Amino acid sequence: KKPFIFEKDDIRIGFYLCTENEFTMATCHTMGANPFDVLDSFDEVKVLKAQCDYVIVLYHGGKEFYRYPSPMLQRYCRKFVDSGANLVICQHNHCVGSREDYQGGTIIYGQGNFIFNSDFYVNHQEFVKDAILLTVDVTKDDFVVSELPIRRTDNGTRLATEVEATETLEAYRKRSEEIKDPHFVTQAYKAFADTHVKRYLREFLGRSFIVRAINALL
């Protein structure tokens, strides 16, 4: 739960990390990741910002294989910026998402995967073929975030070629323009949810002990 503060050349950068509901979250009795708490997390970022020149929030949240923020995720990330964050990076969607420049801060809704070779993700080439690294140029007076596209191959991860980088960044910038419209964010997420609700229900029921027991009896 304690944030990390990095200091160099008289510049202090605070890092605040948290996660949405995951099996790895810390509890009163076990170690684990810092859980996001809508009642505490924003205030903790405010306290951190009072000690630093800049704050970076790493937020493990978002929907897998969804390239846009949900309306609620967008509200959370904007609230982090309102609380003092200069950069908010969301990590859970496992694909290159979109970028929002908001109130002087930067929000990245998904970088993609650097190295993630499990069969589940390899079978979703549309989403895992590319990713972006982030570079942050920092001075006392400026904080600039830029993207560097990379590609996953059978031999590992490499920098994208000029053509590949253009492909990744053009799609990324198009999505970044689309999310400037709040109606788009809402409607796109509704469409995504409508197409996935049946799959989620199937997976939930398929993993249910009671359903498995009934199936075995029948």
What spans do the regions from the language model cover?
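A substrate-binding/cap region within the structured catalytic cores of diverse enzymes
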Residues: 1-5
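Active-site beta-strand termini and strand-to-loop segments that position acidic
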Residues: 6-10, 101-102, 138
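Binuclear metal-dependent hydrolase catalytic cores centered on His/Asp/Glu-rich metal-binding motifs
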Residues: 8-58, 75, 158-159
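Divalent metal-coordination and catalytic microenvironments
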Residues: 16, 56, 92, 109, ...
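Short, structured patches in soluble enzyme cores that scaffold and shape functional sites
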Residues: 17-20, 59-63, 111, 147-149
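Acidic/histidine-rich helix-loop elements
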Residues: 21-39, 63-66, 115-126
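Conserved beta-sheet core of the metallophosphoesterase superfamily
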Residues: 69-132
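A short C-terminal boundary segment appended to hydrolase-like catalytic domains
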Residues: 125-218
